[in-house]
């Protein structure tokens, strides 16, 4: 098998390796591989699923913190997302595809270093639900859940 293949028995260790040096979202978050993770997975797709989960969870936390008016939580989430430019596995992914660039666009918008994402364009703000809370997604962030694959089913 090619070196890029991650066998089912190796997925947990591969996920742990991908998360080294990555600030994890608040309690209750759990790393999951892609849907069908009982099957052999490509390293890139496994990494996209893991980093997508982390990124989406941090964006959710940022939105919930903004809704609650909790400046410290807003800052923590923005800093965690900004740090994505130094996540070793995500940096390695950038050499094999565009997924890391999408993560970094959202991170840059949320951390204030960029006005809008390519995926988000100049869309108007909209409301969405995170858990049981209705929040406003600001102009410029766009449909992060679709762009990052947040709504894709994942298995443990």
Q: What spans do the regions from the language model cover?
A:
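Mature extracellular/secreted ectodomains of secretory-pathway proteins
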Residues: 32-122
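Extracytoplasmic low-complexity, Pro/Thr/Ser/Ala/Gly-rich segments
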Residues: 1-48, 150-156
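Extracellularly exposed regions in secreted/surface proteins, prominently low-complexity, repeat-rich
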Residues: 1-7, 94-156
């Amino acid at each position: 098998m090619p070196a890029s293949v991650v066998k089912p028995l190796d997925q947990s260790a591969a996920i742990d390796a991908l998360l080294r040096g990555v600030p994890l979202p608040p309690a209750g978050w759990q790393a999951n591989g892609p849907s069908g993770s009982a099957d052999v997975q490509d390293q890139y797709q496994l990494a996209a699923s893991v980093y997508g989960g982390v990124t989406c969870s941090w964006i959710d936390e940022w939105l919930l913190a903004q809704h609650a008016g909790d400046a410290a939580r807003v800052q923590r989430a923005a800093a965690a997302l900004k740090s994505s430019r130094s996540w070793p596995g995500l940096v390695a992914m950038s050499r094999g595809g565009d997924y890391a660039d999408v993560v970094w666009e959202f991170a840059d918008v949320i951390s204030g270093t960029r006005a809008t994402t390519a995926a988000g364009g100049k869309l108007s703000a909209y409301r969405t639900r995170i858990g049981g809370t209705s929040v406003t997604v600001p102009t410029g962030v766009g449909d992060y859940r679709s762009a990052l694959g947040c709504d894709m089913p994942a298995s443990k």
